[in-house]
From Swiss-Prot:
Keywords on record: Ribonucleoprotein, Ribosomal protein
Gene3D superfamilies xrefs: Ribosomal protein L33
NCBIfam families hit by this protein: PRK00504.1, PRK00595.1, rpmG_bact
Pfam families named in the record: Ribosomal_L33
GO CC terms in record: cytoplasm; ribonucleoprotein complex; ribosome
Taxonomic lineage: Bacteria, Bacillati, Actinomycetota, Actinomycetes, Propionibacteriales
Family the entry assigns: Belongs to the bacterial ribosomal protein bL33 family.
GO biological process, one term: translation
Chain segments annotated as coiled-coil in the UniProt record: none
Listed name of the protein: Large ribosomal subunit protein bL33A
Molecular function via GO: structural constituent of ribosome
Length: 56
């Protein structure tokens, strides 16, 4: 079966705001968080904790 494009829990990619490397893949609930997600995560390229923002 094919997945719906308007899925409630889509996979999203989190990219580092400093070096722009895409480090993490996670899921989010579109009903609870309709805007772009931002989290503090460890970036192995920067070697420190930075803000990671959802990419399209």
């Amino acid at each position: 079966m094919a997945k719906k494009s308007g899925d409630v829990r889509p996979k999203i990619t989190l990219a580092c705001t400093e070096c722009k490397e895409r480090n993490y893949i996670t899921k989010k609930n579109r009903r609870n968080n309709p805007d772009r997600m931002e989290m503090a995560k460890f970036c192995p390229r920067c070697r420190k904790h930075t803000a990671h923002r959802e990419t399209r």
